[in-house]
A protein has these predicted regions:
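Short coil-to-helix segment of the ABC ATPase nucleotide-binding domain corresponding to the Q-loop/switch region
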Residues: 101-110
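Conserved catalytic motifs of ABC-family nucleotide-binding domains
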Residues: 165
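Conserved ABC ATPase "signature" region
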Residues: 71, 120-139
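The feature captures the beta-strand-to-loop junction immediately N-terminal to the Walker
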Residues: 40-42
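Conserved ABC transporter NBD signature motif
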Residues: 63-71
Length: 255
């Protein structure tokens, strides 16, 4: 199995009030194709910074982030923008959508900017509607953004992240703003996407969410302190035991 993401000696430093803040310190890890990997750790440990940096949404201070063999840090601005648009999908805790567009128009917007192919609006719209149907939200296709629930909106964000058929999805607290029912529904959809072959890296503070992944990385003070291997992502085998075992391991890590 090939590596989707290969991170070596990654460092990220910010200068705040003329003082150096080393947020990531020689981080090393890999994510294989088809994996669904969670990143956990205390608040301020560098979880989100790690996700933003390895995906090229934030600059790398030192080290390498290899995305399917391409060095993120060596790409120019245009090449990096094209890579993120065509081969990466992004989901965030804050569900950003343009309020002057319908739900489906928000979902298909990235397809107009993609260089994967020159498609007609009809074909792009059909693909967006197919994704909405797949995720069970086709009924809100023509709704305004303020007319849908948080759970529906996050599923729409998943559709948008998939519109260009990305190789990998990066999700920062994708269930953080949702209640438990909506959270479970969103995770079920992400698991389905993963089982179809899309690699996923997600940041979460929720043990229940992380226990649905195939592997968990634990970061403390900008360093990967350990990793925990689970069964296949989304496995229904021993779900309660998976959560308990993961929670016990996190406690050992200092959670």
């Amino acid at each position: 199995m090939n590596n989707a993401l290969d991170v070596k000696n990654l460092c990220k430093t910010y200068i705040v009030n003329k003082r150096q803040n080393n947020v990531l310190k020689n981080v090393n890890f890999t994510i294989r194709e088809g994996e669904m990997v969670a990143v956990m750790g205390p608040s301020g440990s560098g979880k989100s910074t790690l996700l933003y940096t390895v995906s090229g949404m934030d600059s790398i201070t030192a080290g390498d982030s290899m995305f399917y063999g391409k060095n993120i840090g060596e790409l120019n601005v245009n090449a990096l923008a094209d890579l993120r648009l065509d081969d990466m999908g992004f989901i965030f805790q804050q569900m950003y959508m343009l309020k002057n567009l319908t739900v489906v128009d928000n979902i298909i917007l990235p397809a107009y900017q993609s260089k994967k192919g020159d498609e007609s609006r009809k074909k792009i719209l059909r693909r967006g509607q197919d994704l909405m149907r797949k995720l069970g939200i086709i009924e809100i296709s023509d709704n305004d953004i303020n007319e849908v629930s948080g759970g529906q909106l996050q599923r729409a964000c998943i559709c948008r992240s998939m519109i260009n058929n990305p190789k990998m999805i990066f999700a920062d607290e994708p269930t953080g703003a949702l209640n438990r029912t909506a959270s479970d529904e969103v995770m079920s959809e992400l698991i389905k996407i993963n089982l179809e072959g899309t690699t996923i890296m997600l940041v979460t503070h929720d043990v229940k969410v992380a226990a649905k992944c195939s592997r968990v990385l634990y970061i403390v003070d900008g360093n990967i302190k350990g990793e925990y291997n689970l069964d296949n992502a989304g496995s229904d085998i021993r779900p309660i035991e998976r959560e308990r075992e993961l929670n016990n391991w996190l406690m050992e890590m200092g959670w």
